[in-house]
Amino acid sequence: MLLPLFFFFLHLHLHLSSSSSISFPDFQIIDVLQPPLTVTATLPDFNNTHFSDESSSKYTLRLLHRDRFPSVTYRNHHHRLHARMRRDTDRVSAILRRISGKVIPSSDSRYEVNDFGSDIVSGMDQGSGEYFVRIGVGSPPRDQYMVIDSGSDMVWVQCQPCKLCYKQSDPVFDPAKSGSYTGVSCGSSVCDRIENSGCHSGGCRYEVMYGDGSYTKGTLALETLTFAKTVVRNVAMGCGHRNRGMFIGAAGLLGIGGGSMSFVGQLSGQTGGAFGYCLVSRGTDSTGSLVFGREALPVGASWVPLVRNPRAPSFYYVGLKGLGVGGVRIPLPDGVFDLTETGDGGVVMDTGTAVTRLPTAAYVAFRDGFKSQTANLPRASGVSIFDTCYDLSGFVSVRVPTVSFYFTEGPVLTLPARNFLMPVDDSGTYCFAFAASPTGLSIIGNIQQEGIQVSFDGANGFVGFGPNVC
């Protein structure tokens, strides 16, 4: 499929305090007539592209965008966009339900509630997985595609015997053929990490309910995961025998949320809770990366304190204080991004949400600030969730104002142009890639994170941006 690709001259600009002498570009240039890029829907050779450094405690995996799967086909760019925005709307709704505690119950009554532990609820919604990794499960390792989810505290794969399974790209994992599979017993310390854990024939059972009512249910186990030559033993993993509502060929999910049962939490002894990622830009044939270990924390990054929400400990909240357009800070209502004592509002960084959502008052002011500085550009009708679009079909290049996030304690992140003005069809229509949130919660989505080195220092409670682009 042919997708428009535009070029930007100025990539990423960060400084450590608002009083820094470092100046910011007020405008960037978009080359509207950059030749379209053909995206080949084939899978890369992960035998060569997921790797680790055996001389360190650094584990690295390649990230693959869902559009690279051969099973994903779209008639055109317009169809691709609308499918992505439908997933995105579902994802946002699921996160809001998760934080509010309103999760749609499973309709499958063949597993009794008292057979399982309490729900480990993920922010991931049906069909919203955007990025995948390739991981070897068991001994010998069977390679599986797994969705990464920064809002989930669970690692799981579909398992035989499969009472109810969705279609996946690889054969369903069979624990009977793994020499390292060990079931977790009731009353064990691992099972106790799931509140009110349930038992079945002496084994620990789990149930993960997602925001739309999809789920995975099965047995909790300890298993070996392999990344190329790196072997990680005794990972607490769900072996799902009943799974409904998953998507696009993934075998399961690699949760990298803030809880102790996530992959990040389980590796904290070796990695200090440190990890980072570079999300591949949409519409390219390249792969991103997911790195675990202290070496994922680069020198020269700009660090922002993480904010903990006891009501939603899986999610990574950050302190956001303001927004800028063209070097001008936009006036916003006081406290519009604050996390309240009751756990409402705040700003979440999420890998599964595509488009950044802002509270309505902040979004309107931000959007209007951008519109006022792009009044010379011809407008187009809104597309999907976007209400601010431009007809750039008659242009060779366009000068646009920069967009910036002002974080707590001073750091400023100025986005590359492709992260805030995106093509939505094959006819030169570009849209301002932000949307209003239905509540006071803000979500920084993966479109705004693309191509930026993002690092999490869980031990010290910081998230870093840069210094590199990727």
From Swiss-Prot:
All residue ranges annotated as the Peptidase A1 domain in the record: 131-466
GO biological process: proteolysis
This enzyme's EC code(s): 3.4.23.-
Pfam families: TAXi_C, TAXi_N
Top EC group: hydrolase
Gene Ontology MF annotations: aspartic-type endopeptidase activity; DNA binding
Disulfide bond residue pairs: 159-162, 165-239, 186-204, 191-199, 278-470, 389-431
Signal sequence, renumbered to the chain: 1-19
PROSITE patterns in the cross-refs: ASP_PROTEASE, PEPTIDASE_A1
Protein family (similarity comment): Belongs to the peptidase A1 family.
Function: Aspartic protease that may be involved in drought avoidance through abscisic acid signaling.
Protein name: Protein ASPARTIC PROTEASE IN GUARD CELL 2
The species this protein was found in: Arabidopsis thaliana (Mouse-ear cress)
Gene symbol of the encoding locus: ASPG2
